[in-house]
Amino acid sequence: KGYENESKLRQDFKGEPIYKDYNDMKAAHAQIKKGLSQANPIGDIAAATKIMKLLDPGSVVRESELAIAMSAAGRLDRLQNFADMYITGKKLTPTQRKEFSALSDELFAAAGDQYNKKRSEYEGFAKRYDLSGDVLGAPHEGNSPPAMPTQDAVAAEIERRRKK
């Protein structure tokens, strides 16, 4: 009976929407990192497309939306991007790659936190009925999403940028 109960617990957990969402996010995060590490046009397009899919999972990424994502940068970066595209055929600047990578990390961390909350809930069920929580799989390990900056920190950053 213990095996059947643990199997049912695992099945119920895997049926939770957050389980699928987390595993989709995990795969997308790995694909984004791999695409950005290529530092070439195909990798850039793959990473940018995957970022757009993460932001709106059920959507089809249109060329115009992809262009918006890839041009998201300040004027200096856009100028650098244009020059790089002209000379090397690359699509994203190093700064844009870092920003895409950081966004991917933050989205993955947030998904991991939600996954771990739901997993903890099921671990509680397992303990209550004297079952092994190991059947749920490993928890997400990684950084938590960054905390929102304080109002003072935001004001200090604005002041620092004004002085430049």
Task: Describe the residue ranges of each PLM region.
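A sequence/structure-level signal for intrinsically flexible, low-complexity segments enriched in small
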Residues: 1-148
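Terminal short linear interaction segments
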Residues: 141-164
